[in-house]
Amino acid sequence: MNNPQQPREYDAVLGGNSPSLEGAAVLGGIEGVKLRLQNPDSKVRIAALEQALNYGKQGLDLVIAGLKDESWAIQNAAYLILNSRTEPRIKQILQKPNHEGFKLQKIEVVTVNKFAEIIQRQQRVARYFIEDLGNGVKLEMAAIPGGTFMMGSPENEIGRHDKESPQHQVSVPSFFIGKYPVTQAQYQAITGTNPSYFKGSNRPVEKVSWKNAVTFCEKLSQKIGKSYRLPSEAEWEYACRARTTTPFHFGDTITTDLANYNGNYKETTEVGSFGVANNFGLYDMHGNVWEWCQDSWHSSYKGAPTDGSAWLDTEENTNLKLLRGGSWCYNPDYCRSAFRDPYNLDDLNFNIGFRVVCSGAAWT
């Protein structure tokens, strides 16, 4: 049995200047929770948020205050704690954008083993801002924190190609990218047209050339008043990997239960229909439709930029641009995080779409 006089993990101990715990008073209750919420260790603060629920409305208010914490980890923990509550007041708070203007959403992230069996499910929080395109059409943009990653594939990765070499370190500033590939409804709202072969307002737009995608970004920028563009190849892979190093953000392989590739579907599917995201809150990064990137085609990464910017100066073929992500009619190897392929900027196909990027303020 625990001795009630002994301090527990995360208890705040008040003992003046004495280095010994003997004779010190353990500050418990709601005041102890408040003190632990000032601790620089995020693990201590998260534990304090969980304990705060033991103290009624006053404790609940402390958790709500955690939504405005400077630390993303604390905001994340506070949101997940509150998301399980049923009070109308709490639900109303969670429906509103936070103090930074982001909409927080709970997402499910899964990991598979080499047999494509799900071995882990995690509840996480992603943050988005939402653009109103008119007539009820919205565009959700996910916040991607800046960071450094290894771009390309290691030599021992199954299914790799030489064009994914050499693997190299890239530092990417923070940015925003579409939660999903651009949908037909979104494309129609901005351009007034829908060229897609597989019709459906919530399916990804396809049969768009690189030039069509760039024109969409230009028109979107004019309408919204922010600068929208295609992702650089480095931004795309960084966003896809979402701090993973495996061939897919799910793990070593994928399954038709998690992605639309050359398997069961034989056409595009509605965006987000598999219900699982990567760690950054992005959907359909593997399969469904290929996605255009800004960059000109280079057959290897020799001389590639390392700052996350698009590689636009090329002497190989100025008409070739970059595709990423694979599609509904391609094998899994082509859907890997590192796979890259050239395509003529004027050509289009019923398996090629895109998603958009908006540069953002720095955070980590």
Regions flagged by a language model, labelled:
Residues 33, 168, 173-175, 201, ...:
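Short amphipathic alpha-helical segments
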